[in-house]
Amino acid sequence: MPVAKPLDLPFDPIERAAEIWGDRFGPADAMAAVTSIMRAQQILLGGLDGLLRPYGLTFARYEALVLLAFSRRGTLPLRVIGERLMVHPTSVTNTVDRLERDGLVRRRPNPRDGRGTLAEITPSGRDVVTRSTADLMAARFGMAGYDPPELGEIFTLLRGLRVSAGDFTPEPGAAAVSAPVTPPSAIRRRR
């Protein structure tokens, strides 16, 4: 899988930052974890976007297409796409604009809501989803260095963060959630 441009440093900059942080501010475990997650996101997104580039997609556009492909009728209101992908309505509009321009989706009026708009995946869009997904699966979504139990651990740890942030309420009996994090709203109030 293509990856972000390697930094090729002779040391781990996050580990070094954690050492300095510890000397100046105190415990660095949370800072090092968050910085590692942010860097991992950059690496993964760069690699995934590189795999999807031959299809004229970014990972954000791919997610929207897959969401439409998953829907029973191949259509969803733009509002629902935004909710499911957890993005701002403007981002959904821009994503659908590009997909429509490329002939992968089309807009049509929502018959249940006279003001709303549906995005509908086209046959070309379904074909692109099938082919691009095969490439992502072959690359294991950039996570080929991890075995299934490790991927499960990563999912569970990050799921706890998402639950604590209020992304969703887990169903009773769902997998255990890791330690809670400070929700973004509480961080904003402290400033």
Question: Model-predicted segments: where are they?
Answer:
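N-terminal leader segment of winged-helix/HTH proteins
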Residues: 1-55
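Short, flexible, glycine-rich and Lys/Arg-enriched loop motifs at helix boundaries
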Residues: 15-26, 71-74, 138-144
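Charged, amphipathic alpha-helical coiled-coil/dimerization segments
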Residues: 97-156
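Amphipathic alpha-helices that form helix-helix packing interfaces
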Residues: 40, 44, 132, 154-157, ...
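N-terminal helix-turn-helix DNA-binding core of bacterial DNA-binding proteins
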Residues: 28, 38, 42, 46-88, ...
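C-terminal regulatory/oligomerization modules of transcriptional regulators
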Residues: 1-25, 149-191
